Amino acid sequence: MENKNNFKFIQGSVTVGDDIATIKFFDSVDAWSTSSFEYEFNYLTEYIKPSKIRVLINSDGGSVYHGMSTFSSILDSKIPTETINVGLAASMGSVLLAAGDVAKMKDYALIMLHNPWSRGAGSDDPMILAFTEQIKTVYKERWGFDEDKIKEIMDGPEGEDGTWINAKRAVELGIIDESNVIKTEPQEKQKVEAAINSVESKSK
């Protein structure tokens, strides 16, 4: 057994042969976060070998270059993966969401898709154009978008940087299956009041 304090991304203690292992990506996508995540993700796939790896995502995005290696690690995992947007999957964070065998999201979570950019580089810069096509390929192959649709979403409304997508819209677009939207449960006080009201209504 490994103590959870030994890890930055793996959640809880893990034991060889666990049913489900959970690992989080709660960070911007950069050289440190991706290399650290991949080290621990590979530890799960090569040593722990659980039946499933659950990847929790809350990320504002970041580097396409570094993010694609993390996308590939999740995508190519021999162990089934489940990516869950628990808050925000923006920019490269949305690419990580697309890597899982199954993608889920909280009903309050958000996805944001836009065109890549870099300081000092225009939209017609060869590197930016190449990164744009790379990301489009991911969205088209993983989520079934055609060229016109993904261009519309990544461009966003006039004057905006891309498109913000809530859970309802994600279902409409086919990004998330309706059954994979995780509902927010009411607080305990509300549950008790609802139960009391139900009993009272039945007694009338």
What are these regions (language model features)?
Residues M1-M92, A99-K204:
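N-terminal organellar transit peptides
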